[in-house]
Amino acid sequence: EHAKSSTYKANGTEFKIMYGSGPVSGFYSADTVAFSGFHLPDFTFAEINDYSGLGIAYRVGKFDGILGLGWDAISVGGVPTVMKALVASEQLDEPVFGFFLGNNEAGELELGGVDPKHYSGDFTYVPLSTETYWGVELDEVKLGGQGVSSTKMAIVDSGTSLLAGPTSEVE
């Protein structure tokens, strides 16, 4: 649908990204990207033209794309992330984001802060254990009050719908 945009620029550089569920590939392009009041002119993004390596849910689901919220260290091809571009353009009050995952209502992604209507009390901040993924150190994992895991790190990943870990501990 490039013809519908007067600001689209073909880059043509090819890429391949390996996700936990399989590879995707395509090429880079640039265009003005606008959403939720944010505006990023000449923003470089990846156009996926082969996602056949992903699971069936991705092939039959109705997706328009993926909004990467990871760190620069895992950005393929050195392309700046959406968060980095929003921070650099001073469009965010704070370089943070928050998710609200509703049970009976639509979820929300809040860029630049968190929506106080979705929580009460204070946040507990923990240091990141890595700046490749949103990794945090764990003291203990409990199930029904019993310690169940020797795993000492977790990755908080908004791009997956599953919990994963060592087979012997998650079965």
Q: How would you label these PLM feature ranges?
A:
Residues 1-58:
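Signature of the N-terminal lobe/flap region of pepsin-like aspartyl proteases
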Residues 66-67, 154-158, 164:
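Short hydrophobic beta-strand that contains or immediately precedes a catalytic carboxylate
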Residues 141-144, 157-159, 167-168:
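Acidic, glycine-rich loop-and-beta core segments that form the ion-binding/anion-interacting portion
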Residues 1-7, 161-171:
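Classical protein tyrosine phosphatase
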Residues 25, 98-100, 153:
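Short, surface-exposed charged micro-motifs
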Residues 30, 80-83, 170-171:
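Extracytoplasmic/secreted envelope proteins and their assembly/folding machinery
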Residues 23-27, 73, 77, 164:
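Soluble non-cytosolic domains of exported or imported proteins
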